[in-house]
Amino acid sequence: MPYQRDTLYDTPQAVVDFRFDERTAAVFPDMIHRSVPGYATLLQLFAVIGAGFVPEGGHVYDLGCALGGASIALQRHIPQSATIDAVDNAEAMTRRLAAYVEGAGISNIRVQQADITALDYRPADLIIMAFTLQFIPPEARDALLVRLRQTLRPGGALLLAEKTRPDDDRMRQWHEAFKAAQGYSQMAIAQKRESLENVMQTDRAVTIETRLQQAGFTRIEPCFRALQFCGWVASV
């Protein structure tokens, strides 16, 4: 998928709340790979782990799909008779993903612009949420996880990845050092951090695991960690 280099915060500006708009969509692949350590590995892990939960004719949700990185990786590993509903509330993201899917001739990914907290879910074998829950208001997270648990068929799983809130400041410093090593300036890092303050509210890892347990997931297994970026397989 064509994309530009992320320079959104390279110049001094009056910082506004981060939005998944056209400007973000145009640079998103570069942004997320340079901002999330191990992102490519996470997508590969979710694809190979997730494929084990998807049977012939199975059904998958990719919630908060953005430009469909997880969906595109997964569809190479699952039966062609299985379908993936890639859902995001950002029109700029879904429009680009729909155009890519059509142009690439990928027939088993269906793209939908919708609010995942109000979606009319149908039974699924696998649900993927990669760095999505952190953008849902904290007071709505438990109810959403309960709905997802109820959506999954017996033997199904939720693959969840989140940026977690560390217990001290060292992890933030290490993450910002990682971003600097990817070519982001200190000004860009600071302005991006400020833009996310009112938009992304992270939980501690233990809080996320508690939310999953209380939602009714019976087996919760960590499968990924790079700095404060974590992934879990939550099975039913």
Label for each model-derived stretch:
Residues G38-E56:
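Conserved alpha-helix/loop element of class I SAM-dependent methyltransferases that forms part
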Residues G57-A66:
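Conserved class I S-adenosyl-L-methionine
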Residues Y61, A70-T117:
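Class I SAM-dependent methyltransferase SAM/SAH-binding core
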Residues T117-I127:
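A short acidic, Gly/Pro-enriched loop at the edge of an enzyme's catalytic core
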Residues D125-A140:
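A short SAM/SAH-binding and catalytic strip from SAM-dependent methyltransferases
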Residues D142-P154:
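A short glycine-rich, Lys/Arg-flanked "PGG" loop and its adjoining helix->strand segment in the class I
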Residues G155-E162:
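Conserved beta-strand signature within the Rossmann-like core of class I S-adenosyl-L-methionine
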Residues K163-Q214:
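C-terminal alpha-helical "lid/dimerization" subdomain adjacent to the S-adenosyl-L-methionine
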